[in-house]
Amino acid sequence: MDSCEEECDLEVDSDEEDQLFGEKCISLLSSLLPLSSSTLLSNAINLELDEVERPPPLLNVLEEQQFPKVCANIEEENELEADTEEDIAETADDEESKDPVEKTENFEPSVTMDTYDFPDPYPVQIRARPQVPPKPPIDTVRYSMNNIKESADWQLDELLEELEALETQLNSSNGGDQLLLGVSGIPASSSRENVKSISTLPPPPPALSYHQTPQQPQLLHHHNNHLGYQNGIHQITSINSAASSCSSPDGDSAFGDSSSTESSNNRCRNSAFSSNDSCRDSLNTPSPTQVSPRNGELNAEEAKAQKIRQALEKMKEAKVTKIFVKFFVEDGEALQLLIDERWTVADTLKQLAEKNHIALMEDHCIVEEYPELYIKRVYEDHEKVVENIQMWVQDSPNKLYFMRRPDKYAFISRPELYLLTPKTSDHMEIPSGDQWTIDVKQKFVSEYFHREPVVPPEMEGFLYLKSDGRKSWKKHYFVLRPSGLYYAPKSKKPTTKDLTCLMNLHSNQVYTGIGWEKKYKSPTPWCISIKLTALQMKRSQFIKYICAEDEMTFKKWLVALRIAKNGAELLENYERACQIRRETLGPASSMSAASSSTAISEVPHSLSHHQRTPSVASSIQLSSHMMNNPTHPLSVNVRNQSPASFSVNSCQQSHPSRTSAKLEIQYDEQPTGTIKRAPLDVLRRVSRASTSSPTIPQEESDSDEEFPAPPPVASVMRMPPPVTPPKPCTPLTSKKAPPPPPKRSDTTKLQSASPMAPAKNDLEAALARRREKMATMEC
């Protein structure tokens, strides 16, 4: 009983303390809040306190007669508490096993200050973060114009010849129909014979007027009807001025077709329209710098730009997309080429090799580099170059390289290193022995790639994986399967159920890393990246970074990923590359020594086509002709024209023992003995031989191309007249000698030292000392 009374007293004291503490808190909050807010707070609290009935004090409820009965009930409840715990646990388990039913018991919520939401007098406005729009796709027109702007004059001449060849095919009866049907008029496998035949045409005149254009009147008429020029005036726009005045020139006047670009790449539809409309007026309206001040006459560059625009209009009719691309070589030099959208990488490599006189090998390739992403990859020969370029974003610093990569087809020359895995024997028979012959290798590679389907080498092992959003690397167990690349999130060797697909190879490409040790803190430089082909963003869901422990592991994984991506097309590309090499090097290897002089005579013509080193060609031709035909002369003709050009035409007479060659050299000034020009004495000997030779007929001789007559002997041996010395104005007189110097006194007089005895060597000094010593001993 006493314990019950003490508990009741403690409860009463605690209730009073809580009430006093609550009142103090309310008063403190009212003083801190503004007047309006404190009034609302106090009214709300009082209203709720009135609604809730406060229980009366315990001593007022319990009467003296009922107090013992209440204490007895409390003791009974304490005794029965332990007995009812097990029953309560069993009923709870039964309720959980049954279907959940919503409880509808009406409980009175407790009154707390958290249930009141007061309006904020100064609400904070949270603005949504603006989304960064993605970069627009590359504009092929602008890309081509930028490459042309940096090209040299001889490269522009080559481009003009290619466009003229295409224009000639479009004007023909069958060429236009073939291009409209999607058949290339200039096959990629053919040589540049048509282009060379067009290059023999006379060059365009240095100046053309708007109304006096004799070449191709039908082209101008068609061009005016399509572009809507008024009064039949064809407005000319130079390439350099168009590239500098507008960053995105019109698709009708540059190296591509806007309509064909839309059909091949729908992503750039809106950006192409906006860029074309913004620059249409600037291209159709000639600026004062584009038209020369001589009454509508054009200079040589504007005439070339006119021809290029005319040929491109014909390209538009054929729905052909061409991009002027720049390829870099290992020494930094740029090779430029106009690429058709239907050309594969193999066709582009062949055109580059033929244009630049390079012996094409199987390991020649085109390498694509992404400087912003620090990755690069080798284009496969069956891919389309134009399609890959159209996936770039605008103003991207991406580059294309033309180089040799021995690792391109290393898995064909060494299949025992790259294609063999512990599970290869489950699918096919493995040859015995470590040293495989060439026949065994070819047979194994053929069987490997002619399976259906082609299964890549099932590579397994530990590789480093870069964490998303951090420059930390963790080692995981990777497994390569035909469906994609899998890894285990846990570092230990997993089972099949623990593998997770990292990337599939259906819509992704395999790249290699560049400088990841400095950029991403990679543990080794042997890095592989798997990226979505159509996107160029540094996001973890689009690009994955993997690193191998050593170089051989890196090469094996790279080959396996390429086979999983491309399959049997790799072997087809290799066989086609070997066929192109045999076609290119076959005629050169069968050339005899008797026809070597003919080959040498063709070298200057090819060099003049590029206008690179005419002096080398001239020296080769002069020396070879003087050595092979010492009795047959050469007619050397010099013109004071610019630019310097060099051409050789060799012809044979009816008599087999007599041949003649006509050499035409055009220089800016008279020939001298510099490295760029033939020596003067050689030219004089050749000229004397040509004047005294009766083999050249009168029809081929031209008085304007001969050397002038030598000067007369008198003018050469003329001596200058003697020059008489001038007479002096005043007579010459002899000069007087200066007075002698005064005598010095004895104090200041220089005194010479006493003469020294002649110097003695060591032997003489020793002998003298010995004689003196012996003389003293005798005394």
Swiss-Prot record:
Q: What happens when the gene is disrupted?
A: Defects in axon guidance in HSN neurons although axons reach the ventral nerve cord in the end. In max-2 and mig-10 double mutants, the phenotype is more severe resulting in axons failing to reach the ventral nerve cord.
Comp. bias regions, Polar residues: 189-200, 256-293, 645-660, 688-698
InterPro entries in alphabetical order:
GRB/APBB1IP (IPR039664), PH-like_dom_sf (IPR011993), PH_APBB1IP (IPR039665), PH_domain (IPR001849), RA_dom (IPR000159), Ubiquitin-like_domsf (IPR029071)
Please name the Pfam families in this protein's record. PH, RA_2
Quote the subcellular location field of this record.
Perikaryon
User: Does DNA-binding count among this protein's keywords?
Assistant: no
Residues of the Ras-associating domain = 317-407
Q: Where is this region: Disordered?
A: 78-105, 189-217, 242-302, 645-763
User: Where would I find the PH domain in this sequence?
Assistant: 456-566
Q: Where is the composition biased (Pro residues)?
A: 708-729
Q: Where is the composition biased (Low complexity)?
A: 242-254
UniProt xrefs under SUPFAM superfamilies? PH domain-like, Ubiquitin-like
Q: Which UniProt keywords apply?
A: Developmental protein, Neurogenesis
Composition-biased stretches (Acidic residues) = 78-97
One biological process term from GO is: presynapse assembly
This protein's GO CC annotations: filamentous actin; growth cone membrane; lamellipodium; neuronal cell body membrane; perikaryon; presynaptic cytosol
Job description of the protein: Required cell non-autonomously for proper development of the excretory canals and for the long-range anterior-posterior migrations of embryonic neurons CAN, ALM and HSN. Plays a role, probably downstream of ced-10/rac1, in orientating axonal growth of HSN and AVM neurons in response to guidance cues such as slt-1. May regulate growth cone polarization by promoting asymmetric F-actin assembly. May be involved in signal transduction during cell migration.
Q: Which family does it belong to?
A: Belongs to the MRL family.
Q: How does it assemble?
A: May interact (via Ras-associating and PH domains) with ced-10 (GTP-bound form).
Full protein name: Abnormal cell migration protein 10
Species whose genome carries this gene: Caenorhabditis elegans
Source organism lineage?
Answer: Eukaryota, Metazoa, Ecdysozoa, Nematoda, Chromadorea
Q: Which gene encodes it?
A: mig-10
